[in-house]
From Swiss-Prot:
CDD domains named among the record's database cross-references: HP_PGM_like
One biological process term in Gene Ontology: glycolytic process
Source species of the chain: Wigglesworthia glossinidia brevipalpis
Assembly with partners or alone: Homodimer.
Site feature location: Transition state stabilizer: H185
Protein name stated in the entry: 2,3-bisphosphoglycerate-dependent phosphoglycerate mutase
Function statement: Catalyzes the interconversion of 2-phosphoglycerate and 3-phosphoglycerate.
Molecular function in Gene Ontology: phosphoglycerate mutase activity
Length: 234
């Protein structure tokens, strides 16, 4: 049976991932560990014969640079790439920049877990004077939808942000049987998975996306979901 494969991958580990900090929309580089992760992922995709017609990523360099490495490794740097703020990581509001240890010490373990793993609970909003406030960032200045840019997000609001982009941009290409790779972030990929598999709240909050490992979703030509699997184990 002919199948359509969609490849999803969380960016390689970033400097703040290695420090266990809330990153969100803060634009942090890949760490050396992360660079090695995505290079290996690219080599594995090549060894399994993967090729693509189109690629999607966010406006954050840890995802963009991860995609660049993947495409270089499979010798497809020339394919079209679309970047969108809608594929950015979940915005962690005022938590951005702080380590999980610091937040747990200040607010307690239960509150930390609610902010991290709750479905509809958003952290405190980021303040306009915060060092990591993004509304004046040049990459967002030309957005007609600037009023939609978040100050903090829950997983639910992240899904709501991604849904129209999925419906209007990504899914039509899949229906057209294009071979697509999406390199994004833990929560934006969780959002896509919820949409793909129609998971409920309890199911999606249990999903964990590791850095730098391609996750494959297979569909038949009628876009009926068949199976999913990671390309390799770490």
């Amino acid at each position: 049976m002919s199948i359509i494969k969609l490849v999803l991958m969380r960016h390689g580990s970033s400097i703040w991932n290695d420090q266990d900090r809330f990153t969100g929309w803060t634009d942090i580089d890949l760490s050396e560990k992360g660079k090695n992760e995505v290079k290996y992922a690219g080599k594995m995709l090549k060894s399994f014969g993967y090729s693509f017609n189109f690629a999607y990523t966010s406006l954050l360099k840890r995802a963009i640079h991860s995609l660049w490495v993947i495409l270089k490794e499979i010798n497809q740097s020339w394919i079209p790439v679309e970047k969108s703020w809608r594929l950015n990581e979940r915005h962690y509001g005022a938590l951005q920049g702080f380590s999980k240890y610091e937040i747990e010490k200040k607010y307690g373990k239960n509150q930390l877990n609610e902010w991290r793993r709750g479905f509809s609970i958003s952290p405190p909003k980021i303040n306009e004077k915060d060092n990591y406030f993004i509304l004046n960032d040049k990459r967002y200045l030309n957005l007609k939808t600037k009023k939609l840019l978040p100050f903090s997000e829950s997983l639910k609001s992240t899904i709501d942000r991604i849904m129209p982009y999925w419906d209007g941009n990504i899914f039509p290409r899949l229906q057209n049987k294009e071979k697509i790779i999406i390199v994004a972030h833990g929560n934006s990929i969780r959002a896509i998975i919820k949409i793909l598999c129609n998971l409920n709240e309890k199911e999606i909050i249990k999903i964990n996306i590791p850095t730098g490992i391609p996750l494959i979703y297979e569909f038949d030509y009628n876009m009926v979901f068949k199976k999913k699997y990671f390309l390799f184990d770490r």
